[in-house]
Amino acid sequence: MCLRMNERGNMKIKRLLTAVLAAMCAATALAFCGCGKTKENVVIYSAAEDYRIEHIRKRMEEQFPDYNVTIEYMTTGELAAKLIAEGKNTGCDIIYDLEYNYMLKLDEAGGLADVSALCNESDFCDDTIISKNFVPTYRNGGAIILNVGLLKEKGVAEPESYADLLKPEYKGLISMPNPKSSGTGYMFCKALVNEWGEDKALEYFDKLSENILSYTSSGSGPINALIMKEAAIGLGMTPQAVTKINEGQTELKIKYFEEGSPYCLYGQSIISGKENREAVKEVFSFLSGKLTEENTEKFCPEKIYKTKTFDVPNYPAEIKYADMSGDTLQAKEAFLEKWKY
């Protein structure tokens, strides 16, 4: 009798164990089905400022929960050098916010895909569409940005001209992006080359360098130095200055000298050979369409659209632009060969 009970007990235990193991196997299989489906990666290389990248990253997560969209930041110079060196054998799928001269060089080398079917090129101003293989992200305007509070602390007046920046009282108070690594830095150089001639412009920057606190690697550097009170005067980007003012940095002031606001266009595209991936096409279409419009509306309202205009609080109106004619990569490379800093 006891033997029969033990046999029955053992049978029940075996059945219970079998049921438990079956349930565990089923759960494991189900878990592997869900976890095994890896998200498709889309890699974006960008020279955009951190706050603009953060907006894009957030919007991509909302729009594409099934994709892993990675944004890697580099300065303009670093990004251009990396893409030129790697060609089509790059880990990058999409370029976002690279200076037009470099976009054109990549395009001429066959490195960019035809993106005309993925965005409405007809929406953009005529001067921004120079190839079917890339479209604008924004028009970057430059200005003289001041920390008026720090100038008052130092007991020095606001500068009124480029010539004023050479005065000894501004020694160590000026920050400028290095044109070798920053498109923003170069556009200031190009504007003065066009205004004064190359020899006079180079002579000017030789003198200005005596007052420069630092040549920063990125266009964001001068305004960051102003906020940290490391510098009082920055040759920087109007959109970034406005963004910081709107965030509460009320000691910043935007100023234009007689020569006007230097500017350059920045673009976006897909690396040639990556345009056949559906994920890349979807991400680029969203980036070049909705997100470029949002970028213009929120941060960078200088005109890139034919019919759309946007007002950002505290953004200067009726900007006088500098002469930026002849802004080619060949001219830039020739100038930078003579740049000492």
What are these regions (language model features)?
Residues 1-42:
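Short, low-complexity disordered leader/linker segments with a strong preference
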Residues 36-105:
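Early extracytoplasmic/lumenal segment of secretory-pathway proteins
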Residues 47-48, 52-54, 74, 91-92, ...:
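Extracytoplasmic ligand-binding site segments that recognize negatively charged/polar headgroups
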Residues 101-105, 227, 232-251:
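A ligand-binding cleft/hinge motif common to bilobed small-molecule-binding domains
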Residues 113-119, 134-135, 163, 250-262, ...:
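Short beta-strand->loop
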Residues 124, 140, 170-177, 204-209, 215-216, 286-309, ...:
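Periplasmic-binding protein-like
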Residues 145-150, 264-276, 295-298:
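A bilobed periplasmic-binding-protein/Venus flytrap-type ligand-binding module shared by bacterial periplasmic
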